[in-house]
C-alpha cells in the first residue's frame, strides 16, 4: 500500500551554491514522530550523511538544505562513466571531472524524539514529484555541465543545485527556483 502526501512546495536557490529551501503542506495521515530528511547518498543510492531533517508539524514542514559541502565520504567523483542520475542515458559527457553528491529524501519515525536519525529507525526513501517531473538535488565542488542522450543537459554551479527532471521522448530539465509547484511524496509501505 502506498500513501501519497501532496505538498505545496516552493524552493529558493540563491545563486551559485546558495541555500535551498523546500517548504510544504502535507495532507494525509502521518504519525507525529515522522521527520522528512535530506541525505547525501553514495553512488549506489545508499544514505551516507543526513544533511537536514525536520518534523512534520501541523501538516507542514520546511527543509533548509545547508550551504555546506557534504562530508568527503558522501562525495564521489563525477565522470562520464558513473552518472546515474534521473533521465541520464548513454552516451554521457561531463565537461570537467569534479566531486559530487546526490541528495535524496527520506522519512523516518523519530522514536526517541531526539531530532535526528538513530540506529533502529528505518529510513523510507520518498520520491518528490513535481507535475510530470521529479525533484533532483545535487552538489558539485566546481562548475560542470552534464550532457546525455535524448536532450539531457544540466549546467551545475558549485554548491547545491536543484532541478525538475521530466523524462519522456526527450528529457526536459528546468531549474527548481523561485515560485510554487505541486509536489507529491510517495511513501511506500
Where are these regions (language model features)?
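Short, ordered, surface-exposed loop/turn motifs in non-cytosolic proteins
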Residues: 29-44
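Hydrophobic h-region of N-terminal signal peptides that target proteins for export
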Residues: 10-18
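Sec-dependent signal peptide recognition
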Residues: 2-8
Amino acid at each position: 500500500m502506498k500513501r501519497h502526501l501532496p505538498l505545496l512546495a516552493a524552493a529558493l536557490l540563491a545563486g551559485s551554491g546558495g541555500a535551498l529551501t523546500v517548504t510544504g503542506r502535507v495532507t494525509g495521515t502521518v504519525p507525529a514522530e515522522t521527520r522528512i530528511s535530506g541525505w547525501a547518498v553514495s553512488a549506489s543510492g545508499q544514505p551516507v550523511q543526513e544533511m537536514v531533517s525536520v518534523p512534520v508539524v501541523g501538516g507542514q514542514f520546511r527543509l533548509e538544505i545547508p550551504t555546506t559541502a557534504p562530508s568527503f565520504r558522501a562525495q564521489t567523483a563525477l565522470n562520464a562513466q558513473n552518472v546515474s542520475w534521473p533521465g541520464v542515458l548513454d552516451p554521457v559527457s561531463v565537461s570537467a571531472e569534479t566531486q559530487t553528491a546526490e541528495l535524496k529524501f527520506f522519512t523516518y519515525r523519530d522514536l526517541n524524539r531526539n531530532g535526528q536519525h538513530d540506529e533502529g529507525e528505518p529510513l523510507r526513501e520518498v520520491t518528490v514529484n513535481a507535475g510530470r517531473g521529479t525533484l533532483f538535488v545535487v552538489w558539485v565542488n566546481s562548475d560542470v555541465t552534464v550532457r546525455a542522450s535524448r536532450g539531457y543537459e544540466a549546467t551545475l554551479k558549485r554548491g547545491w543545485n536543484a532541478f525538475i527532471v521530466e523524462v519522456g521522448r526527450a528529457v526536459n530539465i528546468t531549474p527548481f527556483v523561485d515560485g510554487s509547484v505541486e509536489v507529491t511524496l510517495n511513501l511506500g509501505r
